């Protein structure tokens, strides 16, 4: 079973990024076991490799970090569970297929949300997990941005639990001007982070065996 490591307190993004990159190197060079980091970041905007500078609107005093993950701008902060699976897609029980890996991440998060009575949706040409908030209108509850090096995965998924959604006003989230964001709290689901973590670990082990 893959080990989950919960990093306590609010984590600086760059500190966490170095932690991830160092562990990826250990997996590549020393065959270290797969792990999953569970993180809650201090406030930060991060940009993926497909970002456009005009999508950064008004970041104020929140730091902006340009990363190597896929995707565009997003926000990380308190009340958001960020999950960084470091998996080896070259193992015999895995597949060297990035699209399949992302599909498995999507299935994992949708199944986890379903536990709380929330139906998650996938929208064509829009990465992430979406919630139907009104007729024909969807809001994003989880962002996905990954990177792979020598078939070792890092970066991952960010799920809004009790996130201050106003912070997303400083960017065009994921480059989608008309997109809304939501959280478990906004949907009327109030859950402690450790309780949410139990569910995502259970659902993870059903998909990533």
Swiss-Prot record:
A GO molecular-function descriptor: lipoyl(octanoyl) transferase activity
Span of domain BPL/LPL catalytic: 30-209
UniProt pathway annotation: Protein modification; protein lipoylation via endogenous pathway; protein N(6)-(lipoyl)lysine from octanoyl-[acyl-carrier-protein]: step 1/2
CDD domains in UniProt: LipB
Highest taxon of the lineage: Bacteria
SUPFAM superfamilies per record: Class II aaRS and biotin synthetases
Gene3D superfamilies: Bira Bifunctional Protein, Domain 2 (3.30.930.10)
EC number(s) stated in the UniProt entry for this protein: 2.3.1.181
Sequence similarity: Belongs to the LipB family.
PANTHER family referenced in this protein's UniProt entry, alphabetically: LIPOYLTRANSFERASE 2, MITOCHONDRIAL-RELATED, OCTANOYLTRANSFERASE
Miscellaneous: In the reaction, the free carboxyl group of octanoic acid is attached via an amide linkage to the epsilon-amino group of a specific lysine residue of lipoyl domains of lipoate-dependent enzymes.
Record's protein name: Octanoyltransferase
Organism: Rickettsia typhi (strain ATCC VR-144 / Wilmington)
């Amino acid at each position: 079973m893959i080990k989950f490591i919960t990093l306590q307190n609010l984590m600086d993004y760059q500190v966490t990024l170095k932690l991830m990159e160092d562990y990826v190197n250990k997996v590549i060079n020393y065959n270290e076991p797969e792990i999953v980091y569970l993180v809650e970041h201090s406030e930060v905007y991060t940009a993926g490799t497909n970002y456009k500078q005009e999508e950064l609107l008004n970041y104020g005093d929140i730091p902006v970090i340009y990363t190597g993950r896929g995707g565009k701008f997003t926000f990380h902060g308190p009340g958001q569970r960020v999950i960084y699976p470091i998996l080896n897609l070259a193992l015999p029980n895995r597949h060297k297929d990035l699209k399949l890996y992302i599909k498995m991440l999507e299935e994992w998060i949708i199944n986890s949300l379903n536990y709380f009575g929330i139906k998650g949706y996938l929208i064509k040409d829009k990465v992430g997990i979406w919630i139907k908030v009104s007729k024909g209108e969807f809001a994003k509850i989880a962002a996905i941005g990954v990177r792979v090096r020598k078939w070792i995965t890092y970066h991952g998924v960010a799920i809004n639990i009790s996130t201050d959604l106003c912070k997303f006003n400083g960017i065009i989230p994921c480059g989608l001007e008309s997109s809304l964001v939501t959280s478990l709290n906004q949907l009327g689901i109030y859950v402690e982070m450790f309780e949410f973590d139990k569910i995502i670990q259970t659902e993870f082990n059903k998909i990533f065996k």
